[in-house]
């Protein structure tokens, strides 16, 4: 994914984590974000609050975040 552009999200709450995705809560609402669309997904865990997360520009557009 080195060619991807990233969208930076602040104040992210990780509601749920699976092997494939994170359920996050941000100001715009709740969204399932695939782990492969998150920069450094191993840095996040279920229950994290106030996190800064970078997601691919593509998934942000797909989810209506960007």
Placement of each model-derived feature along the sequence:
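Catalytic phosphate/metal-binding cores of nucleic-acid and nucleotide-processing enzymes, i.e., regions
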Residues: 1-66
């Amino acid at each position: 994914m080195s060619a991807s552009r990233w969208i930076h999200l602040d104040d992210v709450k990780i509601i749920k984590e699976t092997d494939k995705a994170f359920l996050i809560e941000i100001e715009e609402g709740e969204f399932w974000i695939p782990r492969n669309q998150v920069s450094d997904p191993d840095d996040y865990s279920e229950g994290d609050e106030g996190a800064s997360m970078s997601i691919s520009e593509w998934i942000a557009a797909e989810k209506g975040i960007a």
